[in-house]
Amino acid sequence: MISTRIVRFHPSTMRRALLGAGLLLGSAGPLMAQADDSVLPQITVTDSADKKKLAEKVSSGALGDRSELETPFSTRAVKSDEIEDRQATSLAEVLKYDASVSNNSPVNGTHPATISVRGLRLDDLNGYKIDGLANINRGTEMPLEMFDQVEVLKGLSGFMYGFGSPGGIINYVTKRPTDDTFFATDLGYASGGTWKEHVDAGGRFGEDQRFGYRVNLVNESGDTEADHGSINRQSIGASFDARLTSDLTVRLDAIYQRRIATGGTDVIVSGFRIPSPLDGTTRLYSNGSFTDVDYRLVTLSADYRLSDDWKASVAVRHSESVRIYKKDQYYITSNSGNYRDRVTSEYHGYEFNEAQAMVQGKVRTGFLQHELVFGAMAQNLLSTSSVNTPKPYIGTGNLYAPTIYSADSVNYSGGTYRDEKTTQTALFASDTMKFDDRWSVLAGVRYTNYIDAAYSTANTTSARFTANRLSPTAAVMYKPRADTTVYVSYAEALEQSASAPTTTVNANQTFAPIKSKQAEVGVKTEHDGWNGSLALFRIERGSQYINSANVYVADGQSVYRGVEANGSLQLTRDLSLDGSVMVMGSEITHAAAAVNGKRAVGAADMQAGAQLSYRVAALPGLQLHAGAQYVGTMALDSANANMLSPYSLFDAGLNYRTRIGGHMTTWSANITNLANRKYWTYYQETYLNVGAPRTLNLNVRADF
């Protein structure tokens, strides 16, 4: 049963607790520094480009844990140190320099942390994982402070994770207990008036250091530069483990977050031209509007080493999220930016339960070395909604001189009801057959039983879809040398179809699952001082779009063809460059005449990103960084009547690491959207959001 109880932390109470250690350091640090100010501290900074990035492990679901170099699909991992250095505060900021990823969400609002990969928006309920297991992403900006890295698997993931968007999978990897005891605290500020306090502590204790812990606490509150909005967030993350024997480790992970935000109004354009972009600080939301999300997750897991070559794992997870919101949507009514303001008040609750067991190992049959994975998974998702969801128009205005109304009188009523239940059970197996040091073949299959039932307010079944499908994957890999992999891969998948948008005649109608196929050819290579990857892909996916009668339909097929390249280069001892580019064409085929041959919505024709990092040798500990992002044209609607203009964004920042009182202290500053560029971001067909304005983030961190 989804709980509607919301735990409330007072920001000032949590702030006092979190800042206690920081204030102690702040007062003691200068005194300690004065006692030894004749000796300059020795600072050693290791740039990420020095590391073998492609050799690091990424989670590959039913394929087990593999390095990026050994994975026959395109992948990307962003570690927590890079997230902290850039002061990234959202999933979109974490992944902005990966050209395959585009942002589909506002800074605030009811749908944060929504992204597309290869032009395909990820499924909020199946496309985002935590440690490879189910996660509720709808309406939730995950607390990045809780995670060691964020991984992107690009392309079809049906075999590896089950139902999901063919664009890919986002996987958050939680911070784990550390072998050495440590305590860190940091204080951050974002322009507009948002303050954040964060504590991170970890270590081990007990006989033979058998027990480990990692705890993160966050408090964030204040006004935001974007939308003239506000945020109030409290997050708690805890990870515990027990090494019960040399072969058996048991883990317990938990995350809680309460996040209240204002802003993030949707601008809906149909039948008129796209308005000129607005300044990102423009307030568009009414008095009384908000988004309140209460999120919690608990996972119990165990890993057991069966032998030197075999291991088993089992995990059970429960997560739930309650999202209550009152939001504005501006329906454009003229080519000069006039609009009607429609307010929706709604309750949404989600409850995920999942269990998974997996065995991985190696065997040899003759000249073949087999890397085997076997597993089973079961999960169910319950969704509840408000019985009466009012959506009145409360006024009119113009985007360039918006009128702020009151939405206090608009409130959902009648309690809540179960509106949908989705169940998946699956069996999966894969075999990576190594013929020699150069050639290997991967074959895998996943059998899924899928049931999706929608319900009316009278608790009767209004729609029901079932599927029993095999999701195969296959790949051939060739290693001309130990540091290079050339691969060809093929995969099929099913995804839960989108419901009809609320702006259509058949609002909220559900559809049968959609089938997708992907073929990919790529190469990955890693050397001292540089690494790179190149992939060519083709994705076929069943289409959903709004037709000329304003009815959302499932019809035809969307085809995506593209090439993406990524690389890192250590230009000098102190200067490094990361770059990424994707060029893609998309087309709707076998569909109604009005959309046949048109570009797929939300898929940019080109994207690029780059980061430059420079260590200042004259001042050890100082590192400068700059970034650039380009997003090309994309279609706002299936008929291609409106096309979003391309835009470029630039960022810059610095980090300075030094010792104060014997403790490493890091000072960080970062500015996003340096030129304060005005731009629109795509959310879904006909929906726009205002792009984020120039924002300054400051932070100081002390490690004990």
Predicted regions and their residues:
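Extracytoplasmic beta-strand/coil segments of soluble accessory domains associated
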Residues: 54-68, 72-75, 80, 92-133, ...
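Structural signature of Gram-negative outer-membrane beta-barrels, strongest in the C-terminal barrel
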Residues: 241-243, 350, 369-373, 377-381, ...
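Surface-exposed extracellular loop regions of Gram-negative outer-membrane beta-barrel proteins
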Residues: 260-274, 380-385, 451, 464, ...
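Membrane-embedded beta-barrel scaffold of Gram-negative outer-membrane proteins
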Residues: 301-317, 321-327, 486-487, 512-570, ...
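Gram-negative outer-membrane beta-barrel transporters
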Residues: 536-540, 554-638, 675-678, 701
